[in-house]
């Protein structure tokens, strides 16, 4: 995004600490997102459809720390004049990266919504890598179309006498800014909030269904059925009059009669054993079903909680800047008031690129395992070297 060079030339006592803080902030953004990218490269188990979208988010946020902030530091602190070419490159790149980060959050939220609300169809889909890459590329194309053409077209609207400020030509056109803020902030917030509400609603319905007697009656019915079969087998085995008579007159029966008695006894014993096995199978299946449902509910709650945190961080980091930008656009370019709060709101957007890796990827167990795997790989050469020295 853009902020006019309103600070002027600061004294050296303030320039050096601020430059150090800004550079450290950019470096922290790069490190946090680089860990996510490296984890995706190292661990093949992370190459799942939803994790590709986290990779896309990490790439956009990483480039914010690599390009947007480093170019901005000398401009805002040391009054370095970009020049028209570098200024245009910085504006398009910064707007593109920030908007792509926002749209990646929307794509991640939609994917999580599909995995919870339509779990069966989501798992049945075998999305190819080309389709996933197409969705990732579509995010970047849409992000460019939101601001890129307007930045290029409005370059001629700038006042030629003021060449120190690197900002788009439409910053004083409130209606254009309103449309762009609608596309890059308000609609994404509404979309992510909608997906999050739908996830909570789906979890609530699933939980209510699991507590419903008709749903829970499966295990009871199966248990009673197995008990009935078991009792029937025992009754057939103990109350058969033919068996009692055969036992009483076993010395007077022919060998053929004895063999038929043994066959009948063996048949009843097998039926009782079969009934017992069926009852045990039904009970184990019911317990496994309840465990799977409980695991799905826990997974859905975790996803919903992570999306709620992701949405809250995005709204907090972007809302102040959008509000300030629209309000300041109503002033003429040369009469806009200078405000420290606007500078803070401006940096909050980039702060969102810093917190994104810690909101979901680095808190996910698979990403954590991949992170420790990276550390083990880096420590392994040093360990082998120490062993060779000791030997």
UniProtKB/Swiss-Prot annotation:
The keyword Transmembrane applies. Glycans are attached at residues 5, 159. Interacts with TSPAN4. Keywords: Cell membrane, Disulfide bond, G-protein coupled receptor, Glycoprotein, Membrane, Receptor, Transducer, Transmembrane, Transmembrane helix. GO terms for cellular component: membrane; plasma membrane. Belongs to the G-protein coupled receptor 1 family. It comes from Mus musculus (Mouse). SUPFAM superfamilies: Family A G protein-coupled receptor-like (SSF81321). This is Histamine H4 receptor. The H4 subclass of histamine receptors could mediate the histamine signals in peripheral tissues. Displays a significant level of constitutive activity (spontaneous activity in the absence of agonist). Residues 238-258 are annotated as: Disordered. Disulfide bonds join 87-166. The chain crosses the membrane at residues 20-40, 53-73, 88-108, 132-152, 175-195, 307-327, 344-364. Residues 41-52, 109-131, 196-306, 365-391 are cytoplasmic. The lineage of its organism: Eukaryota, Metazoa, Chordata, Craniata, Vertebrata. Its main location: membrane. Residues 1-19, 74-87, 153-174, 328-343 are extracellular. Gene3D superfamilies: Rhodopsin 7-helix transmembrane proteins (1.20.1070.10). The keyword Glycoprotein applies. It is found in: Cell membrane. Residues 247-256 have a biased composition (Basic and acidic residues). It is a multi-pass membrane protein. One of its GO terms (biological process) is inflammatory response. One of its GO terms (molecular function) is histamine receptor activity. The gene is Hrh4.
């Amino acid at each position: 995004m853009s902020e006019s060079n309103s600070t002027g030339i600061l004294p050296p006592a303030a320039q050096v600490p601020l430059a150090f803080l800004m550079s450290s902030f950019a470096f922290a953004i790069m490190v946090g997102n680089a860990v996510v990218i490296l984890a995706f490269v190292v661990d093949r188990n992370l190459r799942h459809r939803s994790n590709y979208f986290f990779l896309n988010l990490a790439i956009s946020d990483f480039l914010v720390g690599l390009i947007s902030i480093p170019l901005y530091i000398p401009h805002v602190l040391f009054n370095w004049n970009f020049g028209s070419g570098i200024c245009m490159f910085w504006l398009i790149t910064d707007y593109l990266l920030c908007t792509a980060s926002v749209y990646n959050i929307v794509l991640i939220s939609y994917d999580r919504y599909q995995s919870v609300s339509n779990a069966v169809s989501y798992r049945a889909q075998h999305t190819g890598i080309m389709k996933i890459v197409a969705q990732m590329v579509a995010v970047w194309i849409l992000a460019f179309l939101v601001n890129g053409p307007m930045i290029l077209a409005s370059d001629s609207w700038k006042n030629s006498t003021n060449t120190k400020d690197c900002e788009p030509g439409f910053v004083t056109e409130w209606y254009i800014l309103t449309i762009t803020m609608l596309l890059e902030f308000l609609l994404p917030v509404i979309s992510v909030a909608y997906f999050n509400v739908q996830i909570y609603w789906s979890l609530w319905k699933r939980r209510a269904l699991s507590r419903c007697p008709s749903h829970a009656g499966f295990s009871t019915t199966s248990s009673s059925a197995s008990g009935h079969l078991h009792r029937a087998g025992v009754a057939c085995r103990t109350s058969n009059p033919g068996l009692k008579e055969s036992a009483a007159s076993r010395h007077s029966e022919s060998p053929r009669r004895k063999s038929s008695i043994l066959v009948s006894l063996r048949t009843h014993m097998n039926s009782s054993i079969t009934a017992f096995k069926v009852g045990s199978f039904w009970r184990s299946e019911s317990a496994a079903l309840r465990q799977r449902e409980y695991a799905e509910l826990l997974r859905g709650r975790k996803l919903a909680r992570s999306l709620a945190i992701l949405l809250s961080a995005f709204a907090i980091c972007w809302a102040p800047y959008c509000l300030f930008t629209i309000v300041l656009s109503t002033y003429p370019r040369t009469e806009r008031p200078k405000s420290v709060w606007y500078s803070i709101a401006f940096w909050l957007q980039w702060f969102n690129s810093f917190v994104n890796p810690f909101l979901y990827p680095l808190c996910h167990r698979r990403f954590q395992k991949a992170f420790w795997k990276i550390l083990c790989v880096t420590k392994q050469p040093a360990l082998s070297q120490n062993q060779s020295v000791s030997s």
